[in-house]
Amino acid sequence: MARYTGATCKLCRREGMKLFLKGDRCYTDKCAFVRRSYAPGQHGASRKKLSNYGTQLREKQKAKRIYGVLEGQFRNTYERAEKMRGIAGENLLKLLEMRLDNVVYRLGYGASRTEARQLVNHGHFLVNGKKVDIASFKVSVNDVITVCEKSRGSERFKMFAENPKALPKWLEANVENFEGKVVAEPAREDIDVPVNETLIVELYSK
């Protein structure tokens, strides 16, 4: 499956803000955005004022980069969001939040969504007792996500268990059992990503 293989820190510089794509490193002085907060490239330091289209496009790119989704997947997710009841932009964020890789990240099994995606792809998780290694798998309310028995002894998972993460309202966790549960669909106020989804809807509505 296609994925972005370029320099991760350049993505934050391109969007003009920290997207926290590299986990703990983003909170330190080693973060590239701290040292060079302007866009990459020869003319990056002199940002031009964006047109309405440019602003909408940047918002879409930002959302794609935060969730680690490429254009085709993102477009398909938006088309699904449009067909759902409710507000298309909020539906889009809800669908992105309920990807398995994002849920694993929200449960604290990964310092970043990138790391969580790798853990899913390597087969470390069960959903309702069945192994799922597809990062884009959509979880549902009442689904139970569990770390595979053979993975629990690794130092990485022990570290996650010893340093539990604050959870959003729509998730519950049983740290001792290496288990998390989706107890509700995320509401917009539960989604703490710096994205204006209305701009994305406007872009796709053209």
UniProtKB/Swiss-Prot annotation:
This is Small ribosomal subunit protein uS4A. The keyword rRNA-binding applies. Part of the 30S ribosomal subunit. Contacts protein S5. The interaction surface between S4 and S5 is involved in control of translational fidelity. Belongs to the universal ribosomal protein uS4 family. Keywords: Ribonucleoprotein, Ribosomal protein, RNA-binding, rRNA-binding. CDD domains: S4. InterPro entries: Ribosomal_uS4 (IPR022801), Ribosomal_uS4_bac-type (IPR005709), Ribosomal_uS4_CS (IPR018079), Ribosomal_uS4_N (IPR001912), S4_RNA-bd (IPR002942), S4_RNA-bd_sf (IPR036986). It comes from Clostridium perfringens (strain 13 / Type A). One of the primary rRNA binding proteins, it binds directly to 16S rRNA where it nucleates assembly of the body of the 30S subunit. With S5 and S12 plays an important role in translational accuracy. HAMAP family: Ribosomal_uS4_B. The lineage of its organism: Bacteria, Bacillati, Bacillota, Clostridia, Eubacteriales. GO terms for cellular component: small ribosomal subunit. One of its GO terms (biological process) is translation. Transmembrane segments: none annotated. Residues 98-163 form the S4 RNA-binding domain. GO terms for molecular function: rRNA binding; structural constituent of ribosome.
